[in-house]
Amino acid sequence: MKYVLSLDQGTTSSRAIVFDEKGNVVSKVNKEFRQIYPRPGWVEHDPVEIWESQIEVAKKAIEEAGIKPEDIAAIGITNQRETTIVWDKNTGKPVYNAIVWQCRRTAPICDELKEKGYSEFIRERTGLVIDAYFSGTKIKWILDNVEGVREKAEKGEVLFGTVDTWLIWNLTGGRVHVTDYSNASRTMIFNIHKLDWDDEILELLNIPRAMLPQVMPSSHVYGYTAKDIFGVEIPIAGDAGDQQAALFGQACFQPGMLKNTYGTGCFLLMNTGEKAFESKSGLLTTIAWGINGKVYYALEGSIFITGAAVQWLRDGLKIISNAAETEELATKVPDNGGVFFVPAFVGLGAPYWDMYARGLIIGITRGTTREHIVRAVLESIAYQTRDVVEVMEKDSDIKVETLRVDGGAVVNNFLMQFQADILGVPVERPVVNETTALGAAYLAGLAVGYWKDQEEIASLWQLDRRFEPSMNSEERERLYSKWKEAVSRSLGWEKR
């Protein structure tokens, strides 16, 4: 029997998961690595540590599954997106640490681009807003600030890659320098309509084309692992950014299908098919994946603070000792007691885009209890999700019929039920919650014929529980309009 190995390289840990042909988890190994903060607002990783931790867990996962490397039909890769690595082509050594997606050091470069009026130019071509989050300005920073790198880049002696590219390059012993459409679409230098690096943006940021990887479909045999790694050559056949991989793992193959990943923040992606919709509400237009000679697009909305607000209840207010308690506490009261919580700890993302908004708790009376505060925090996750779903429907003109969910918080039945109630559509929780790794496995398996087609994959998707909306529409709209009112009071607070 054959299996698929998924390498899930995340922001805080490297993971490897072995899946069988039914999409079930056979083994799973995780290893955390260092977060490096050289200055306030700067975040780095050591690329060598990323590679070493990833290969260590890969070998362990095969061992723990009780199988041999030759039993692996293909390897799929999924990764933290936007994080930028530049390395020497000849020695394979990084010229600088990986600059992580969270790193804000290039904000001044972004401000300058915006001041010069390039926002629309960048958005039309890349589907993105100008922000330090994306790879483009990070590459420029390395070229401008690390001695000797620019000269080498002009000669094609250094290479750029997002994390997937770095892993594939190392897995193939330096033979293959590629990325996929989904990861390329997060760099801010890739034209998502022409499906190529954008020469005018490269000129604007002064990035030599010679250092960039070849862009390929997300399901494709890119190359084979070097023999000295696993003792056999295994095809590397799937590659997608983490959020896009989760959309694929949730089998959201039809336009209008939508998933929400509940983590520290939330990421909503809606499949929009072969059409790239331009957002009027500050959502990102991104590539979902490239497969079978076609490219599929998605709208993406990110919510900064969701699970992080629950962590704040635990570590900041110390009114809970773990996240699991929140469900029981929230259900001890019949409603939120008029309390609303806006988790604008770092401003608000889509659709408000207000960096000066700050958190608030409003509606407090003498009768307010710990339970009401906890419930208000959980409810805020659902309200923020509705904020994004509403603008997605408006931008795409597609009505959402169901929401598929994954991530840590989906075990909270109260939250899932309230999410269905406040959206007015069913929420579907799958049996396999490892949707990101599963998506990468599916992409790899499809490329080597391990799975036949997307129909087969859609049939493997198993429902754990479906939450039907049970709230009447008057109550739903009453709560939601109160939420909107609470948000309006948090906006611009830092500047007032």
Curated annotation (Swiss-Prot):
Residue positions binding sn-glycerol 3-phosphate: T11, R81, E82, Y133, D242
Binding site for ATP: T11, T12, S13, T264, G307, Q311, G408
Database matches in InterPro entries: ATPase_NBD, Carb_kinase_FGGY, Carb_kinase_FGGY_CS, FGGY_C, FGGY_N, Glycerol_kin
Catalytic reactions of this protein: glycerol + ATP = sn-glycerol 3-phosphate + ADP + H(+)
Any Gene Ontology biological process: glycerol catabolic process
Cysteines paired by S-S bonds: none
CDD domains noted in UniProt: FGGY_EcGK_like
Pfam families (UniProt xref): FGGY_C (PF02782), FGGY_N (PF00370)
Binding residue positions for ADP: T11, R15, T264, G307, G408, N412
Enzyme class, UniProt record, top EC level: transferase
Entry-linked HAMAP family: Glycerol_kin
Role: Key enzyme in the regulation of glycerol uptake and metabolism. Catalyzes the phosphorylation of glycerol to yield sn-glycerol 3-phosphate.
Protein's UniProt name: Glycerol kinase 2
Source organism per UniProt: Thermotoga maritima (strain ATCC 43589 / DSM 3109 / JCM 10099 / NBRC 100826 / MSB8)
Top-level taxonomy: Bacteria, Thermotogati, Thermotogota, Thermotogae, Thermotogales
